[in-house]
């Protein structure tokens, strides 16, 4: 509209777009407002058509125009043969009626029409403003909802990405742990196989050593049996300590008689030297060791010269007790004198 003004009164202003939001109280009256807007729009369209066609007419003019049009139709029906003449007459009548309406129209009718049109347009403008405010509210709500939806969607995407990353990280960690456990298991299995082989080898060696020991034990027992059978002692009754003392005295007496006999033989033969075997058999010892076995039943003594032994021993018939005698050296000089025993 250029000025939206009809008769010099205040102009009709349409609603302008504003960034302010209205209250949501009008949401419940959307249906009523929509029906009112449609009615007002229809009325406004009718008024605009009238203004574009013939201009605005009063109700009286509309009543005059309607019977004239009906009379014209009736005259056309009656006089079919004189259509051309009647048309000319009707055009002349229309021109006359228009002139009469223009001359006899009162200013009150025009003011009423203007007021009616202004009211209709004003109501139309108000309804349009309400519709614009509702549209703004709905757009703002739509914008908020879309932003919330985008935020929720972006948050879900971020959470999904984080969960995927966590899953991949845990999967990689589990794979590494599984591989390390497999390596440890393989190493331990290899160690077990190696130790099994070593244990088998050691068992074989132990079995071989046990066989060798058994063979040597059999040979040693056979040697011991042969040696014990060769050195069997004559059986005798067990002796008391007093008998052992008497036996020791007897042996000492026997030794003394032997010494005296040796001295007498030296005097008669002018030189008799008794030397006992020493040094050739043992490297450290120059004396002979006498082992005298005593048997009270036999009543005699048996002397054995053993160069390998160092101590003089007296054994009974059963070999249970052994009497150790001191080492004795006996020798005589050329002139027959006896030296002390050292």
Curated annotation (Swiss-Prot):
GO terms for biological process: donor selection. Signal peptide: none annotated. Residues 308-319 have a biased composition (Basic and acidic residues). It comes from the Eukaryota. GO terms for cellular component: nucleus. Residues 15-25 have a biased composition (Polar residues). Residues 1-36, 57-76, 299-322 are annotated as: Disordered. Disruption phenotype: Leads to a defect in donor preference during mating-type switching. Does not affect FKH1's overlapping role with FKH2 of regulation of the expression of the CLB2 cluster of genes during the G2/M phase of the mitotic cell cycle. Interacts with FKH1. Present with 2120 molecules/cell in log phase SD medium. In concert with FKH1, plays a role in directionality of mating type switching by controlling which donor mating-type locus is inserted into MAT locus during mating type switching. This is Protein FDO1.
């Amino acid at each position: 509209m250029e000025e939206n003004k009809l008769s010099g009164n205040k102009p009709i202003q349409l609603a302008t777009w504003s960034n302010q939001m209205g209250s949501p109280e009008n949401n419940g009256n959307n249906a009523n407002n929509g029906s009112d807007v449609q009615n007002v729009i229809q009325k406004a369209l009718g008024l605009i058509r009238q203004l574009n066609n013939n201009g605005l007419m009063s109700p009286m003019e509309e009543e005059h125009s309607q019977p004239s049009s009906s009379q014209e139709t009736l005259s056309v029906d009656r006089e079919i043969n004189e259509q051309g003449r009647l048309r000319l007459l009707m055009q002349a009548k229309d021109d006359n009626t228009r002139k009469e309406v223009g001359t006899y129209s009162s200013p009150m009718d025009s003011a009423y029409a203007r007021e009616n049109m202004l009211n209709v347009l004003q109501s139309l403008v108000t309804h349009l403003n309400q519709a614009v405010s509702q549209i703004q509210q709905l757009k703002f709500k739509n914008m908020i909802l879309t932003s919330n939806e985008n935020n929720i969607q972006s948050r879900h995407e971020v959470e999904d990405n984080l969960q995927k990353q966590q899953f991949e990280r845990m999967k990689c960690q589990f794979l590494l742990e599984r591989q390390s456990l497999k390596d440890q298991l393989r190493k331990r299995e290899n160690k077990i196989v190696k130790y099994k082989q070593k244990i088998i080898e050691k068992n074989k060696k132990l079995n071989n050593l046990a066989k060798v020991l058994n063979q040597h034990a059999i040979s040693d027992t056979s040697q011991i049996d042969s040696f014990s059978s060769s050195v069997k002692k004559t059986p005798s009754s067990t002796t008391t300590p007093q008998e052992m003392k008497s036996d020791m005295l007897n042996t000492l007496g026997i030794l003394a008689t032997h010494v005296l006999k040796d001295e007498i033989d030296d005097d008669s033969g002018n030189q008799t030297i008794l030397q006992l075997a020493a040094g050739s058999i043992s490297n450290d010892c120059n004396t002979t060791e006498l082992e005298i076995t005593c048997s009270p039943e036999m009543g005699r003594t048996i002397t054995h010269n053993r160069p390998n032994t160092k101590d003089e021993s007296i054994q009974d018939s059963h070999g249970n007790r052994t009497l150790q005698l001191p080492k004795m050296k006996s020798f005589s000089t050329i002139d027959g004198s006896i030296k002390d025993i050292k």
